[in-house]
């Protein structure tokens, strides 16, 4: 895989300029569906930190789009390049994510990332940032709200309400599992608002998280221990 350009071209390392870059990159986000009508491959990504935050670990899982079984799993580790700054997490996570993407043997048709898409104060969470840099269709799946407000969705699986910021919709609050807090679902790049919701519902099984980010989360939390692949014993978790 190759990216469409430098990750942080022109950034001097300051918070103010990072916020300005976010606003500029947000203008390049495409919010219409460009996902293949018959996608073959999905990917899930999640990021964690090791060694007291000195090392950034990105987990990547490539899945069959029809069975949702994993075909490849990879973990990339890079030195953490900046401290945690609220609203600028993508600058911290993106280098490791790009390394993990490069480990995949095939290009995914659609990417799910554990984090925000455009449901972000400057409309550029990690899934949007990753999408603009790589050109890949992306969806952000977050466990908590970062921006905007929403009415609590109904109690049943699939119930959803729009997340609004400044009068505009930036995502969905989705009840992916009864008696669980809603997920924050938002398009990242080359996916519409309805497309982000539809693909998330399509990739849910009996868990709170959709399969791509659920498997990536498992891999990331195991510090590199791999789940079974589709060619091996079927997954039973």
From Swiss-Prot:
Molecular function, one GO term: RNA endonuclease activity, producing 5'-phosphomonoesters
Signal sequence coordinates: none
Main subcellular localisation: cytoplasm
Keyword Cell cycle: no
GO process annotations (BP): DNA repair
Entry superkingdom: Bacteria
InterPro entries from the UniProt entry: Endonuclease-V
UniProt function note: DNA repair enzyme involved in the repair of deaminated bases. Selectively cleaves double-stranded DNA at the second phosphodiester bond 3' to a deoxyinosine leaving behind the intact lesion on the nicked DNA.
Gene3D superfamilies in the cross-refs: archaeoglobus fulgidus dsm 4304 superfamily
Location(s) in or outside the cell: Cytoplasm
Protein family: Belongs to the endonuclease V family.
Identification of the protein by name: Endonuclease V
Cofactor(s) demanded: Mg(2+)
Annotated EC: 3.1.21.7
Gene: nfi
Gene Ontology cellular-component terms listed: cytoplasm
Catalysed reaction equations from the record: Endonucleolytic cleavage at apurinic or apyrimidinic sites to products with a 5'-phosphate
Binding site for Mg(2+): 46, 114
Keywords: Cytoplasm, DNA damage, DNA repair, Endonuclease, Hydrolase, Magnesium, Metal-binding, Nuclease
Residues at the site labelled Interaction with target DNA: 84
Residues that span the membrane, as ranges: none
Provenance organism: Xanthomonas oryzae pv. oryzae (strain PXO99A)
